[in-house]
Amino acid sequence: MIKVLVACANGAGTSLIMKMRVEKACKDLGVEVSTIHHCSLSEGKSAATQYDVVFCPLNFKNMFTDAEKKGVKICGMKNVLSDKEAQALLKEAGFAE
């Protein structure tokens, strides 16, 4: 089971939409999730190391380099509305086949 963090600038609209896409992608790929949390970038940056994977808009991916150095997979999404992109990123991160 993995712990997923989804972050956007304000932690409201975009991260909630991304959370729904990631939940659907995990379900479709059979990835078991223990926790999925959405939040603002500032909260996400400080909490990222407590998660296995972080999803954020691609232009904010560089904010999570410290967590990435500690083994957290960082998935930057180009299209936050895309189920297929969320699935592809989960596969690239090694959580699904």
Regions found by a protein language model. Name each.
Residues 14, 63-64:
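Glycine/Thr-rich phosphate-binding loops of Rossmann-like dinucleotide-binding domains
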Residues 38, 56, 76-77:
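Structural signal for conserved beta-strand scaffold positions within catalytic alpha/beta enzyme cores
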Residues 41, 58-62:
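Short, polar loop motifs at secondary-structure junctions
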Residues 68-70:
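Short, structured coil segments at secondary-structure junctions
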Residues 47-49:
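A short, aliphatic-rich alpha-helical micro-motif
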Residues 73-97:
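Ser/Thr/Gly-rich flexible loops in soluble cytosolic domains mediating phosphotransfer, phosphorylation
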Residues 2-41:
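Conserved active-site segments centered on acidic
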Residues 52:
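Conserved acidic residues
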